[in-house]
Amino acid sequence: LPLTLNYAKSSAIVSESTPSAEMMQTSIGQGKTQITPMHLNMITCAIANDGVLMKPYVIDHVENDEGTVVKSFKASEYGRLMTEDESAILKQLMTDVVEEGTASKLRGLNYTAAGKTGSAEYNNIKGDSHAWFTGFAPAEDPEVCVTIIVEGAGSGGDYAVPIARRLFDAYFNQKE
């Protein structure tokens, strides 16, 4: 993705000569598949945004020493990644992960959340994995998306979800 921010690039190396077993691993994000937190967060935000992929930005405005806004930045679209119906299906599945699955540490809060956990193996011999979570809140009308990776930690539900919860809590607490 062409961004003005510097970040590592995602990659998935597959070709017609890729062995079937490796192709199957790639389909679930294992093997030689590499995705950056930035890229995954953009995809997650597109799901939350009814299928529209937005360009990320870090600062929404700049103020002078008197607190007057001297420059504002606005969200802009890359384009549509999926239909609204496809997005709605993914939102429901991601809500189910919180309500019934591996992101249950986000259940029963003063806001709703939706997301997907992951445990990306990086050492086939030991079975070591990176803990992932990507999601948004509130589930029914998203305002904020987060993507967490804790390298070498293990399960996304055990290690990445609690960090996501702290970020969501901070976001909603500052709004009060």
Write out the residue ranges for each language-model feature.
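Beta-lactam-recognizing serine transpeptidase/beta-lactamase-like catalytic domain environment
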Residues: 1-148
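Short amphipathic alpha-helical face segments that pack within enzyme cores
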Residues: 36-42, 159-166
